[in-house]
A protein has these predicted regions:
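Conserved class I S-adenosyl-L-methionine
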Residues: 1-38, 52, 73, 131-156, 160
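A short glycine-rich, Lys/Arg-flanked "PGG" loop and its adjoining helix->strand segment in the class I
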Residues: 118-132
Length: 260
């Protein structure tokens, strides 16, 4: 089991506060800046927790899917986002989806609670055909103690959480898919008390390539070798042994993808 269903990513009560809303607004800004979602793209949010991250992409007219091992959490997400939101019960280390099924896959505060982060990352990459977004709590930030950060980001205080460094995540990515161009950034650079009188200071600093933030995000481009067919063939085709030729639009398309 990858997640503790009773504690992993509990509903974020702090989001109801003004500062909690500010924290989420900064996360949202970073996510949209790095991911740049387009209308109609398919998005999978792994361990979709309260549905807040799915809402970000739904507002951009994406087709959203959330997965979580908890039926209770999934029902809350469904109630919050509506019937057009697809929710699936499942585990992050064994995603019940086809290869390269989604344009975007997000892992937001997921690796921190995963028993096997490399396996979770590998599965996210497998089902993606575009880009994977990884959002995590920065081990090197000066914004607060680890317990304070867990509280601010709605993570269970009693559970042991793994805090990552940016280089650790990069090495994990490169160990999975090899060298690739990674775009990254961070937000929330200061202790909480600073924002009560100098909120503008945060927004004066750049998002991209900034290692100071408590919440760090990076986007990993995913290029598949073979594309799994996600749409049905619209024309009938008579297959038989003597014909010895492929159905139109299958093997030919695979070869074209490899030659790009």
């Amino acid at each position: 089991m990858v997640f503790d269903q009773n504690t992993a990513n509990l509903p974020r009560k702090n989001l109801k506060s003004a500062f909690g809303q500010y924290i989420f607004s900064r996360q949202k800004e970073l996510i949209l800046y790095l991911v740049a979602p387009c209308s109609g793209e398919r998005i999978l949010d792994v361990n979709c927790d309260t549905g807040d991250h799915l809402q970000i992409f739904k507002e951009k007219w994406c087709s959203v899917t959330g997965i979580n091992p908890s039926a209770q959490i999934l029902q809350k997400v469904k109630n919050k986002l509506g019937a057009d939101t697809e929710i699936v019960a499942g585990k992050a280390d064994d995603l019940p989806f086809s290869d390269n099924e989604f344009d975007i896959v997000t892992l937001i505060n997921v690796l921190e609670t995963a028993k096997n982060p490399k396996k979770v990352l590998s599965e996210a990459i497998r089902v993606c055909r575009g880009r994977v977004f990884i959002g995590f709590l920065n081990n090197l930030t000066l914004a607060g103690t680890k317990q304070r950060l867990k509280e601010l980001f709605g993570l269970p205080l009693s559970q042991e959480i793994r805090f990552f460094r940016l280089n650790e995540i990069k090495c994990m990515v490169e160990g999975t898919i090899g060298n690739t161009k990674i775009k990254w950034g961070s937000v929330l650079y200061f202790p909480a008390f600073v924002y009560s009188f100098f909120e503008e200071l945060e927004e004066m600093l750049p998002l991209e390539n900034n290692p100071l933030g408590a919440f760090t995000g990076l986007v990993v481009p995913v290029k598949y070798t073979f594309q799994t067919i996600q749409t049905p063939l619209m024309e009938s085709f008579n297959m038989n042994r003597k014909a010895q030729r492929a159905a139109p639009g299958t093997a030919r398309d695979m070869v074209q993808e490899m030659q790009k």
